[in-house]
From Swiss-Prot:
<comment type="similarity">
    <text>Belongs to the bacterial solute-binding protein 1 family. WtpA subfamily.</text>
</comment>
<dbReference type="GO" id="GO:0015689">
    <property type="term" value="P:molybdate ion transport"/>
</dbReference>
<dbReference type="GO" id="GO:1901359">
    <property type="term" value="F:tungstate binding"/>
</dbReference>
<dbReference type="GO" id="GO:0030973">
    <property type="term" value="F:molybdate ion binding"/>
</dbReference>
<dbReference type="InterPro" id="IPR022498">
    <property type="entry name" value="ABC_trnspt_W-bd_WtpA"/>
</dbReference>
<dbReference type="InterPro" id="IPR050682">
    <property type="entry name" value="ModA/WtpA"/>
</dbReference>
<dbReference type="Pfam" id="PF13531">
    <property type="entry name" value="SBP_bac_11"/>
</dbReference>
<protein>
    <recommendedName>
        <fullName>Uncharacterized solute-binding protein MMP1652</fullName>
    </recommendedName>
</protein>
Amino acid sequence: MILAFSGCVDQSASDSTSEDATPKVLKIFHAGSLAVPFGEYETLYENEYTNVDVQRESAGSVACVRKITELNKTAEILASADYTLIPSMMMPDYADWYVMVAKNEIVIAYTENSQYYDEITSDNWYEIFQRDGVKYGFSSPNDDPCGYRSQMVVQLAEEAYGDSTIYDNLMLGNTNFEVNENADGTYCIVSPESIDVNEAKVFMRSKEVDLLGPLETGAYDYLFIYKSVANQHGLSYIELPEDINLGDYQNADEYAKASIFLTGQNKTIVAKPIVYGMTVPSNAEDYEEGVNFVKTVLEHPEVFENAGQPVISPAIAVGDVPEEISDLVVMG
């Protein structure tokens, strides 16, 4: 290892069935990996509440939160691919509660245009990545949880595969990331405010959904991506061992051996199982409509399941949860 330091609420709360009223706007800021299920939830909700216009903005989860906390934008729903962003970045000033609704894992996606696609396995992917001409992609750790989780997966791979050069060869040698080894044997990746990559080896974009088209057209070979997104887009992929893929609750202690420091945000994030979280921001223009949308999501977990994302059932809630959804969650 090279070390460097540096269902519906009462209609009084959701008066959305009046055909004569001006349509309400229900704004959603959500993680890019939630585009497919939230597209389905949008259709479901608008069909039930015909006077509501659901408007979604997809971005990296960190960017979604910062729209509210730094750019003074408002939304009725904030849905993050990393539930911990809500308590760490929004509470108590911008949120009072959140629910954990679904989970995921990191896989490596590819196409038939990918070099050595017929050779890559869960055991040799990091060796394939080091071959001449092979190019791999991930989203920006500064903008997107999928991006910093991809870094964590590669760091955790060193112990899992018994090779202390994996992160060095794949990341340190091709980016300006750094790594600190702590006294307790854990590792902290340092993501600089401005990330530079060796474009001959690495393909990086702000969020994971921006990487899909270029992968499919052969701009690069392999992509660290959520399993649900790979399924939704019909991509081939290899699964990674449970002790590094961030998809297994029972490996939480193992995952915690890796962390990342986001320099531009002065924030350290410790690796943990991938869990999606939702809240209604405190400054939502129509708070009750937001709560009603969350209620609809909780009442229709099949939408997540059909999108390849295992649900957490019942959903786990933290904080001052609205009474309208209290019967649909367990308190965490």
